[in-house]
Amino acid sequence: MKIRDAYTIVTCPGRNFVTLKIVTESGTHGIGDATLNGREMAVAAYLDEHVVPALIGRDAGRIEDTWQYLYRGAYWRRGPVTMTAIAAVDMALWDIKAKAAGMPLYQLLGGKSRERVMTYAHCTGQTIEDCLGEVARHVELGYRAVRVQSGVPGIETTYGVAKTPGERYEPADSSLPAEHVWSTEKYLNHAPKLFAAVRERFGDDLHVLHDVHHRLTPIEAARLGKAVEPYHLFWLEDCVPAENQESLRLIREHTTTPLAIGEVFNSIHDCRELIQNQWIDYIRMPLTHGGGITAMRRVADLASLYHVRTGFHGPTDLSPVCLGAAIHFDTWVPNFGIQEHMPHTDETDAVFPHDYRFEDGHFLAGESPGHGVDIDEELAAKYPYERASLPVNRLEDGTLWHW
């Protein structure tokens, strides 16, 4: 099962996606997601210049060996660009192997650990009342879990909140980074009020999640975690910048609120101490940025030893290829927690036809061989790349801060 061809496809059906397609001599093909939000062309260039030439002629069935070749052989290890490129190759090779075996990916991984995959929706609003309306709408759609974000009084732009009701939230909206103003004090005073309102309106049975998006210092995060304990959050996500793993120890010592982190991680070494010391409850590193299925199996296996569960990052800046592969992984992995779900646009779904489906607050993996997602290259070509950048944050005094 030699690799005959490999190439990248860059398309923008509403937002940019990078896809790697690998074709074997028998004609079987697999695809992998190589999207890195705001740095898409860096990964595409890495693949085109350094990875694709090395794939031609290799045995597509030797997934582990290829992963090690791309990781160890590069010398410059880890980092988001390298690991996203490796993940795309890995995802495509698992797709090919499952197709060759004639089985859906979850079967090749070891079979089902569950019948369906619980997801959480994003519920936002400029005001708490607007957010509550979105929660009600998603509960009607069958969701048992929601991530809630609302505008903070006195802050013009708040992370995760669309500019107008019903609009999709898309932070990468200009060719150069937009600058937003952030106030930790105003946020900390406001956030508990949001959770109190959700619990008062919807009771205790609904799973409630919240994303801080790396904005706080460790002691500020500890204060927030303690303050929201009465509202029994499913998790508090990315409450501090991810580089300082020791900060999670301090937060853990101050609060029983479950902690989730990892969407900007790229390697098992980014989360090893967090898992082994049980400073977190959920690991969120996505397949696309964490080195693919091969690497994330190792992360999940390690996490299972310490009662840490998966909660994969799943926004619309990762393509349906990543989501499809993640749903198969979620269906198999024993220590599954939850899967993020932000619906893609109709244009994106048309470019990436898939057989996974959403039903009553859950995803169901498809039964076709592989991960069940393909790409319509002719349609993809109609949506050329459009440069876009994520915003940056400044404090009210002008100091650059974490976005």
Swiss-Prot record:
Substrate binds at N37, H122, E263, R284, H313, D317, E340. InterPro entries: D-mannonate_dehydratase-like, D-mannonate_dehydratase_GalD, DgoD-like, Enolase-like_C_sf, Enolase-like_N, Enolase_C-like, Mandel_Rmase/mucon_lact_enz_CS, Mandelate_racemase_C. Signal peptide: none annotated. Binds 1 Mg(2+) ion per subunit. The active site is at Y159 (proton donor/acceptor), H213 (proton donor/acceptor). One of its GO terms (molecular function) is mannonate dehydratase activity. Its EC number is 4.2.1.-, 4.2.1.39, 4.2.1.8. The record marks P315 as: Important for activity and substrate specificity. It is an enzyme of class 4 (lyase). One of its GO terms (biological process) is carbohydrate catabolic process. It catalyses: D-mannonate = 2-dehydro-3-deoxy-D-gluconate + H2O; D-gluconate = 2-dehydro-3-deoxy-D-gluconate + H2O. The keyword Metal-binding applies. Pfam families: MR_MLE_C, MR_MLE_N. Its cofactor is Mg(2+). PROSITE patterns: MR_MLE_1. Changing P315A: Strongly increases activity with D-mannonate. Slightly decreases activity with D-gluconate. Belongs to the mandelate racemase/muconate lactonizing enzyme family. GalD subfamily. This is D-galactonate dehydratase family member ManD. The lineage of its organism: Bacteria, Pseudomonadati, Pseudomonadota, Gammaproteobacteria, Oceanospirillales.
